[in-house]
Regions:
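Repeat-solenoid scaffold signature
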Residues: 162-194, 263-287
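Outer-membrane beta-barrel proteins
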Residues: 60-74, 130-138, 143-145, 153-155, ...
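Extended hydrophobic-aromatic, low-complexity segments
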Residues: 137-141, 157-159, 195-197, 284-287, ...
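Surface-exposed extracellular loop regions of Gram-negative outer-membrane beta-barrel proteins
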Residues: 78-93, 116-177, 269-275
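Surface-exposed, low-complexity loop segments enriched in small/polar and acidic residues
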Residues: 1-122, 162-163, 189-266, 291-310
């Protein structure tokens, strides 16, 4: 202050206008002036750009005329082979206000919006085939096999970091139609989901998370008898000496650190599907499909919610 209790700017070269945040008008409202409000306020601008380049090709063929067919079917093997090259780029630019947690510290916007620059390149080869086994027989109008395979080679770059990984995916299935109205199908597949640029290269950032006791998601490690065990709370950095002596947060808010991981590889899902399609001839334009799915995901890509991080 200026020695008389009035706020002053330590450095006024940037157009600083002082504001006493504790000063109130007679009606209890803040006594901030228009000039001071204009100085501390700002408009955060974030711009983004995405770009995708895809190049590929396929060759299809029917090998019935070459004699590659089942003796009990009226058609033979058909299939395709192909390749694809794909490049995905993403860029995000943030101004100075957006890159600061809470804007200028008083806007209450939470964590900072950090710039991102990254790209993912993938080269793939794939093949698919379909093979009728039996057609036009009693109780077997059509029985056939389908299968496919894809090899993917990924290269990622962003924020001066790079990584590479590959993945194999495939599927195999069988379909049986005893007549025109019913078809049963079974399929086994392995699929992947590769990490995107955000998963890989978003910067480490500290934001806010609500863990208010009001909604039942309070700090499980606070209070004299914490809900979480000492071992669980140790995962958050709480020492044994601190366990049972942490006061609940009066604000109900906590810092949460998030960020990408440039070492991520593709998550993998194994899927088993069994289904039936019913197309009753007595009801025109009606088709009913019933399917059962069993999906198991390994190396899943995601974040751990604050409520379950113990």
């Amino acid at each position: 202050d200026d020695g008389n209790g009035n706020p002053v700017c330590r450095d006024s070269s940037g157009g600083c206008v002082p504001w006493n945040i504790f000063e109130r008008n007679a009606d209890g409202t803040t006594a901030v002036t228009d000039e001071a409000a204009a100085f501390i306020a700002g408009v955060g601008i974030v711009t983004g750009e995405t770009e995708q380049t895809v190049f590929g090709g396929t060759i299809e063929g029917d090998f019935t005329n070459m004699g590659i067919q089942s003796p009990m079917a009226d058609a033979g093997l058909s299939g395709l082979i192909g390749f694809e090259m794909r490049e995905d780029k993403l860029g995000r630019l943030a101004d100075d206000i957006s890159k600061i947690s809470g804007g200028r510290g008083l806007t209450g916007t939470g964590g900072a919006t950090l710039p991102i620059a990254g790209e993912i390149e993938v080269e793939e080869i794939f093949m698919e085939m379909s093979m009728p086994l039996i057609t036009g027989k009693p109780m077997i109008q059509e029985l056939g096999l389908t299968a496919g395979y894809r090899y993917s080679d990924y290269t990622t770059n962003g924020n001066g970091l790079s990584n590479s990984f590959d993945a194999d995916t495939y599927f195999a299935g069988i379909s049986w139609a005893p007549n025109d109205e019913v078809r049963f199908r079974f399929n086994q597949a392995v699929a992947i989901r590769a990490p995107n640029v955000f998963d890989l290269y978003v910067g480490i950032n500290t934001g806010l998370v609500e863990l208010s006791p009001v909604n039942g998601d309070g700090d499980q490690c606070s209070g004299p008898t914490p809900v979480a065990t000492q071992a669980q709370c140790a995962n958050t950095g709480l020492s044994a000496a601190q366990y049972g002596s942490v006061d609940p947060s009066a604000a109900g808010q906590f810092n949460l650190i998030t960020g990408g991981n440039p070492n991520l590889v593709a998550e993998e899902g194994e899927t088993t599907t069994f289904g039936v399609v019913i197309t009753p001839s007595m009801i025109e334009n009606l088709s009913v499909s019933i399917d059962y799915f069993d999906i198991e995901v390994t190396d899943a890509i995601g974040s751990v919610p604050a409520q379950t991080s113990y």
